[in-house]
Amino acid sequence: MVIMKKMKDSVLFLVVGLFSLSVLVSQSIAGRVKAPLLQSNTGGLVFSKSFNSIYDTSMYGRLQLNNGLARTPQMGWNSWNFFACNINETVIKETADALVSSGLADLGYIHVNIDDCWSNLLRDSEGQLVPHPETFPSGIKLLADYVHSKGLKLGIYSDAGVFTCEVHPGSLFHEVDDADIFASWGVDYLKYDNCFNLGIKPIERYPPMRDALNATGRSIFYSLCEWGVDDPALWAKEVGNSWRTTDDINDTWASMTTIADLNNKWAAYAGPGGWNDPDMLEIGNGGMTYEEYRGHFSIWALMKAPLLIGCDVRNMTAETLEILSNKEIIAVNQDPLGVQGRKIQANGENDCQQVWSGPLSGDRMVVALWNRCSEPATITASWDMIGLESTISVSVRDLWQHKDVTENTSGSFEAQVDAHDCHMYVLTPQTVSHSDV
């Protein structure tokens, strides 16, 4: 959370091709294997010998959640970035309605997540969490029923501390009771924050809620919000479906770019079942330009970050809806191969001319040319840089223009990119037969 931060106590030799995703994911979730997510049988026709080191996934570990969730990054909406504590059941219902009427729900934005301030300031006489009687008078169960009736899922918020960041009751030492009541209400998602944690290490505080959620018998997405304090990518793959790798995002260019760089560090650790989380989307909140928001959405999608809308979807501009509803970029984020793309090269003053890329199913690549400079720049992605064999020919599709740029390009690809803008492409090999997973 932003407002109460001062109250913390302590704060892939050759690969891709046809990928046996479902087998590996199911085994990983059962905790039976620890192996790279990318498997080789392309025979070296597409990818260079350096591909394995560029897109390393060997650090991805075993999952212990047993909830079968997060095979692709979660998509939905969260109340905090726009509403903060100014939430109530009407806002949540209207947001669910807007996700459906705008078409966003059909694109995958299915989680409607309530953040802090939903509960009363005190537990009841039996020690149970209670919805605030003025803002959620109908209770969470009826609200969940309404959200479910729209084909969506309801998320809720708590904290791995004695209080939430806004000083509502936390779930530390109440994990079993709170998990049980969340399940009884029909909750589908839990964001679990890190305030008022009594100085207890996150690696000790977060597993009890995992175990309590598992014990309910209900599949509840478990989102760890530890702010990256103790490098959760190193251990949270055994605990949650996603883990925050950074402090809170703000609706500024500086905050968004900094967080993208911090999250990039942990690319090798993410994959189906558990994802690095660089925090929610700020698109539509007004602090950045249209071009900057395009970059925000492009890089979050390429990084396989959760796509959680943070604006008021009831009152979106056409530009905001255009960005959030880009089906081709959403498809990159939700690609079944599930490998986080990463920053491959940075040139220019302050490394502002950047190439980000990653593998997709069907021997394809996604490439983002991101100009973080203050002037237009020509940015080049070479095959050697992104791990393609130098002789391979590809077709190039522009995901923002929704058109094929070229059908036969080899060696490299470049584009003129405006200041603070981002171009995003899918490269498909033309000389190899392949099938999408």
Swiss-Prot record:
The keyword Iron does not apply. One of its GO terms (biological process) is carbohydrate metabolic process. It is found in: Secreted, Cell wall; Secreted, Extracellular space, Apoplast; Vacuole. Its EC number is 3.2.1.22. It catalyses: Hydrolysis of terminal, non-reducing alpha-D-galactose residues in alpha-D-galactosides, including galactose oligosaccharides, galactomannans and galactolipids. Transmembrane segments: none annotated. This is Alpha-galactosidase 3. It comes from Arabidopsis thaliana. The lineage of its organism: Eukaryota, Viridiplantae, Streptophyta, Embryophyta, Tracheophyta. The gene is AGAL3.
